[in-house]
């Protein structure tokens, strides 16, 4: 069984679509419900649908992207910083020594963890 999709209700579907396409290699799959459905190379579908009334996500909710190498994590963080995207500090050795991570936020404020875990 595979996790297939995530539906995010967002304030600005266009800005979120551009963010995920530019920084996380998603591509438009189709448009519906006034929003965008974008897919990555692994086949995961992210639905970015306009919210009628915005409700903040629960504390601790985040999306995680695992990258292939620790250098990929630092390169993406640098790219996001250059583009003015807010990022948290680069951390390593948490929860074990084969772990490198940072946090950032999409245009709607959804927290994203980018990491490499040695697997």
Q: What is each model feature region?
A:
Residues 77, 82-119:
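Vicinal oxygen chelate
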Residues 5-7, 37, 62-64, 101-103:
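Short aromatic/hydrophobic contact patches that present stacked aromatics
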Residues 1-15, 63, 118-119:
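N-terminal beta-strand motif that seeds the catalytic metal site of vicinal oxygen chelate
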Residues 27-59, 111-116:
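Conserved short beta-strand elements that form part of the metal-binding/catalytic scaffold
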Residues 1-2, 56-60, 96:
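Short glycine-enriched loop/turn motifs at secondary-structure junctions
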Residues 15, 70-75:
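Short, conserved charged micro-motifs
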Residues 12-27:
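Amphipathic alpha-helical segments
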């Amino acid at each position: 069984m595979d996790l297939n999709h995530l539906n995010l209700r967002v304030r600005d579907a266009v800005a979120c679509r551009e963010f995920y396409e530019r920084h996380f290699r998603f591509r438009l799959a189709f448009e519906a419900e006034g929003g965008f459905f974008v897919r990555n190379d692994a086949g995961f579908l992210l639905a970015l649908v306009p919210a009628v009334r915005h409700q903040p996500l629960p504390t601790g909710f985040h999306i995680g992207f695992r990258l292939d190498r620790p250098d990929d994590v630092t390169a993406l963080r640098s790219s996001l910083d250059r583009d003015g995207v807010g990022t948290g500090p680069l951390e390593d050795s948490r929860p074990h020594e084969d772990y490198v991570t940072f946090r950032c936020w999409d245009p709607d404020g959804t927290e994203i963890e980018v990491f490499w875990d040695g697997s």
